[in-house]
Structures are given as C-alpha cells and as structure tokens.
Amino acid sequence: MEIDYYDYEKLLEKAYEELPENVKHHKSRFEVPGALVTIEGNKTIIENFKDIAEALNRDPQHLLKFLLREIATAGTLEGKRVVLQGRFTPYLIANKIKKYIKEYVICPVCGSPDTKIIKRDRFYFLKCEACGAETPIQHL
C-alpha cells in the first residue's frame, strides 16, 4: 500500500491550521472611510480624520505628519478633525491618504492591511501580522 505524502487537500488543511487567528477569520474587505473635507475661508478641515486613522490602525499624529509633509502646509489635530492651513481639494486629500496606505499600511509582500510599524535600533519596519514579513520604511 502506497502512502501519498503530498495529498493536496491535507497539505492545504495543514497550512490553514497554521495561519494566525486574525487571518483565518478575515472575510471582510479592507475599507477606509472617505475623507469628509470642508473648506472654510483659507482653511481645509478633514472632519473624520481620527476615524480614518483608526480604520488604518495608525497613530493619528503619524498620519498627520505624513499629510503635512506631502502637501507642504501647517495643520493641527483638534479632537476628531484636522485643520490644515490653505485650500486643498478633497481629491488631493484622498490621493495623499491612498499614498499613505500604500507606503505605511499595506504589506508589500502579501497585500494584507494587518500591519504595524515597529522600530528596531534606528530603523523603522512595516511588520505584517498575516505573513510575518518585515519591510523597511522611511521614517517621517
């Protein structure tokens, strides 16, 4: 009697059992709320900024620092919203948030949004909680 050591179904089941719990039951798509942008005079306000940062599982200050550098302006975090000096279109704000997600949230190895930023010595890494990959990222 021959034993098939490479039975596909058994190997697939074994691989599935070794996945972390947060990956096994992850059935929903990664969704980030759209930025609610209003312009008042010479100021641009992102009303749901803290909600966006929470959806990305990131510190709001980190996301704010990225946005301020990208659009070259000053701004402050006031409760759940951000006030930026200058007039910026919702399209520009949305594109900058997408760029942040690509660089600082999505794992470049497996594409999972389940990541965190870790610091080792003087370097920062994007650590994926799904596949375990650590990718160096630029410090803000």
Swiss-Prot record:
It comes from the Archaea. SMART domains: eIF2B_5. SUPFAM superfamilies: Translation initiation factor 2 beta, aIF2beta, N-terminal domain, Zinc-binding domain of translation initiation factor 2 beta. Keywords: Initiation factor, Protein biosynthesis. GO terms for molecular function: translation initiation factor activity. eIF-2 functions in the early steps of protein synthesis by forming a ternary complex with GTP and initiator tRNA. NCBIfam families: aIF-2beta, PRK03988.1. This is Translation initiation factor 2 subunit beta.
